[in-house]
């Protein structure tokens, strides 16, 4: 993995937050789809 110098100096937290938001989005979408199909 290359480490590019980041002018904003943002840590890994941004990637971690986007990862958690993606997992939350997939989870909510799965729950809504399952409730839609089972009703």
UniProtKB/Swiss-Prot annotation:
Keyword Transmembrane helix in record: yes
Keyword Thylakoid: yes
This protein's GO CC annotations: photosystem II reaction center; plasma membrane-derived thylakoid membrane
Transmembrane segments: 18-38
Location(s) in or outside the cell: Cellular thylakoid membrane
GO BP, sorted A to Z: photosynthesis
InterPro entries per UniProt: PSII_PsbL, PSII_PsbL_sf
Superkingdom of this protein's organism: Bacteria
Keywords, alphabetical: Membrane, Photosynthesis, Photosystem II, Reaction center, Thylakoid, Transmembrane, Transmembrane helix
Main location (coarse class): membrane
Topology with respect to the bilayer: Single-pass membrane protein
Stated family: Belongs to the PsbL family.
Subunit composition and interactions: PSII is composed of 1 copy each of membrane proteins PsbA, PsbB, PsbC, PsbD, PsbE, PsbF, PsbH, PsbI, PsbJ, PsbK, PsbL, PsbM, PsbT, PsbX, PsbY, PsbZ, Psb30/Ycf12, peripheral proteins PsbO, CyanoQ (PsbQ), PsbU, PsbV and a large number of cofactors. It forms dimeric complexes.
Stored NCBIfam families: PRK00753.1
Record function comment: One of the components of the core complex of photosystem II (PSII). PSII is a light-driven water:plastoquinone oxidoreductase that uses light energy to abstract electrons from H(2)O, generating O(2) and a proton gradient subsequently used for ATP formation. It consists of a core antenna complex that captures photons, and an electron transfer chain that converts photonic excitation into a charge separation. This subunit is found at the monomer-monomer interface and is required for correct PSII assembly and/or dimerization.
Protein name, as recorded: Photosystem II reaction center protein L
Organism of origin: Synechococcus sp. (strain CC9605)
Source lineage: Bacteria, Bacillati, Cyanobacteriota, Cyanophyceae, Synechococcales
């Amino acid at each position: 993995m290359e480490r590019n110098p980041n002018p904003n100096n943002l840590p890994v937290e941004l990637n971690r937050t986007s990862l958690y938001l993606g997992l939350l989005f997939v989870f909510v979408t799965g729950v809504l789809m399952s409730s839609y199909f089972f009703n």
